[in-house]
Amino acid sequence: MDIVFIKELCIETVIGIYDWERKIKQFVCIDLELGTDISSASNSDVIDDTVDYKAVSKTLKSFIGDSEFQLIEALAEESVKLIFEKFNVNYIKGRFSKPGAVTGSKEVGVIIERYRDSA
């Protein structure tokens, strides 16, 4: 399996459990590893034969930007489900974080791994 990756995709959204968080937008930053077979694309040199990371990024920017999740866990799970629905990937490892959410910490968040069969 090959990996197409996206690193430090940061998207503004409403996220959090506190009243003040429901009134503002905060950044969620994402690192993704998308498992797929890139052999066709490496032979053809055609974007349609691989996972288009720009299309994945655009999909996530729209979905997350318009969402209002309370928990980063829910945002992560639903984002991964959406990627499986729209793109030809068999595996996703996603790191979803909220920079500055905890005083004294650079960022907090979750890392999830899913295979297509368990999505």
Go through each PLM region and give its residues.
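N-terminal, polar/charged subdomain of small-to-medium soluble alpha/beta proteins
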Residues: M1-A119
